[in-house]
């Protein structure tokens, strides 16, 4: 039998029994979706609902990608993802479609923050009085740079795209105390002040009318009732796509008439179109032919810098709920919130700006880090998922390096021949979250459906 590249037209159309490619062509899919995170699952649903034959390939043994609802301390917790909001049109549509609600945020009045070498305590009102002018200064030009967030090309953003988060922080000329207060609040969003671009934070604020308060509420306040997996499973159960778990992909080759996807086991899968819905930091592990455009390849090679961690802690005793902040690089644990009562004990959720600074499985190390905020805390147990060391994530949510928001991501959203890209990491409006993943999956699926219809008509 001849190889695909030399398979003759006659052979293809007469389906010779001894030709492996002809045998595969009988089972050609309309679309192969690679990655069953939120973007891949919703795209597979929409494509199959449009009448296309779809296969959904996932390297893990579960769907959901970087959203992951699991068990800890005898209850359900979110290891990745969690929050949604009624102002997020794409995710709200899905929640309404499947009759899934939101849980109210935990009420917390006590705030603890480490600044200028000291621990400070106050109420939410007192902390807001302190932080509001700092955040206003930090985000003040968000709408100036992104007046129409759905179209970032309307003005030249090259100046702001060159700047890092540290450039913005330095430009504010804050006192040590003020700088630490602002650094601490933003630490949940920061891995490296030097590697992350300021443009994405300003863009996020601009999508919420330049109102940083609205942005923070939407980003991390209202958990999905039943967990993110309830939503992901509801979407998948509404799909007729063929799902294959534990199926990593190594190669995606666009040969013009069809795309050949090679799995780690060596299986060849053929499709008219391929939709790559993988995390940005994983795409470099897949050989894509032909090569993508240079700005896209540069972003793939550079990866995004977010090597953060989310940690769940079981602590002895019930104590007054609090939220705590410490600046990046000044404590291994940077944000803490008392999330639940658990019998006679308490469960805390913690966010770590740099996962390499602490072993999240080391109870003593975690207790020592938490003693910055509560000196008498006794940690009983800890649990987390290391997204940085997860080969199918290699990091948490996306935050672009300087230049990538406007100079690379838009190119990645365009078709690459018969290969398309989707995911929360490259979403047009809400990159970095579930809303962006769903947005990207829906929009890209619609583009593929249109392209297939045009090909059929033409």
Predicted regions and their residues:
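Glycine-rich FAD pyrophosphate-binding loop
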Residues: 48-71
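Mid-domain catalytic core of redox enzymes
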Residues: 247-358
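N-terminal Rossmann-like FAD-binding beta1-loop-alpha1 element of flavoenzymes
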Residues: 30-56
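Mobile amphipathic helical/loop "lid" adjacent to a hydrophobic cofactor/ligand pocket
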Residues: 9, 21, 96, 101-197, ...
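Conserved FAD-binding subdomain of flavin-dependent enzymes
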Residues: 66, 74-105
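Conserved flavin/dinucleotide-binding core of flavoenzymes
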Residues: 42, 50, 124, 258, ...
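Active-site/ligand-binding neighborhood in enzyme catalytic cores
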Residues: 151-248, 255-258, 277-279, 287
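Extreme N-terminal leader/targeting segments of oxidoreductases
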Residues: 2-31, 49
